[in-house]
Amino acid sequence: GHAKGDKKVSKK
C-alpha cells in the first residue's frame, strides 16, 4: 500500500 493504499493508511 503506497499510492492506492495511502488514502486509507497514512502510515505507509
From Swiss-Prot:
Keywords noted in UniProt: Ribonucleoprotein, Ribosomal protein, RNA-binding, rRNA-binding
Recorded GO MF terms: rRNA binding
GO cellular component terms, A-Z: ribonucleoprotein complex; ribosome
Coiled coil stretches, renumbered: none
Function: Protein S19 forms a complex with S13 that binds strongly to the 16S ribosomal RNA.
Entry similarity comment: Belongs to the universal ribosomal protein uS19 family.
Record's protein name: Small ribosomal subunit protein uS19
Natural source organism: Elm yellows phytoplasma
Taxonomic lineage of the native organism: Bacteria, Bacillati, Mycoplasmatota, Mollicutes, Acholeplasmatales
